[in-house]
A protein has these predicted regions:
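Short aromatic-glycine-(Arg/Gly/Cys) micro-motifs in beta-strand/loop hairpins
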Residues: 1-40, 70, 94-137, 162-171
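Short, mixed-charge low-complexity intrinsically disordered segments
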Residues: 38-93, 139-141, 149-192
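C2H2-type zinc-finger recognition helix
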Residues: 145
Length: 192
């Protein structure tokens, strides 16, 4: 996903945060309102940067001020109503053939809501200012998967945004892609 990364807004009082790398588009905008192009995959993101670049070229969208992100999603989502984790899969009516970047840098882990079970919605660390009371890194992300999961299991996301909550490894991409990959064993590949 190409995103226009925003600096920490003044209302977000988490002083350790410099900018917001969240998956949601509430603070750092996506390159476009991309759902309308119907080129996304079953995770409601993209299989490769080339798909996004084609949309941008066809629609006259400037990507020069955008950062390219790649995401890997934990294969379970947390439902606060049942207070438990359950498996989820990509939407089968969309082709999901994620291309893994050759040169990616892990920036941290985001927790994002999927109330409609389609596209990413809110990232409560930034959208609901949870980062003011939960330790995060300079990009408003958890440093580890374990920190993200423990925060959810510990109820720190209660009363923020309606879930379910999904955990995403968030990477910046430098250049290039490899062949199709399913990612690490514990996290399913999920291109941005």
């Amino acid at each position: 996903m190409y995103k226009r990364v925003a600096a920490r807004p003044d209302w977000l009082k988490a002083k350790t945060v410099l900018d917001v790398y969240s998956l949601s588009h509430c603070i750092s905008d996506d390159f476009a309102d991309y759902i309308n192009y119907w080129k996304h995959n079953g995770y409601w993101l993209f299989n490769s940067p080339e798909v996004i670049e084609e949309i941008a070229t066809n629609e006259g969208i400037d990507l020069s001020e955008s950062t390219l992100f790649y995401y890997e999603v934990y294969e379970y989502e947390f439902d606060e109503n049942s207070n438990g984790w359950s498996a989820f899969k990509p939407e089968p009516s969309f082709v999901t053939n994620v291309q893994m970047p050759m040169d990616k840098q892990l920036e941290g882990f985001d927790v994002t809501t999927f109330c409609a079970h389609t596209s990413p919605e809110c990232s409560p660390l930034s959208c609901n200012s949870l980062a003011t009371t939960i330790p995060v890194n300079k990009h408003c992300l958890f440093n580890s998967f374990e920190e993200a999961k423990q925060a959810i299991d510990g109820g720190l996301f209660r009363n923020s945004e309606p879930g379910p909550y999904r955990i995403f490894a968030t990477y910046t991409v430098k250049n290039g892609l490899t062949n199709h990959s399913t990612g690490p064993a514990r996290i399913a590949a999920h291109a941005g």
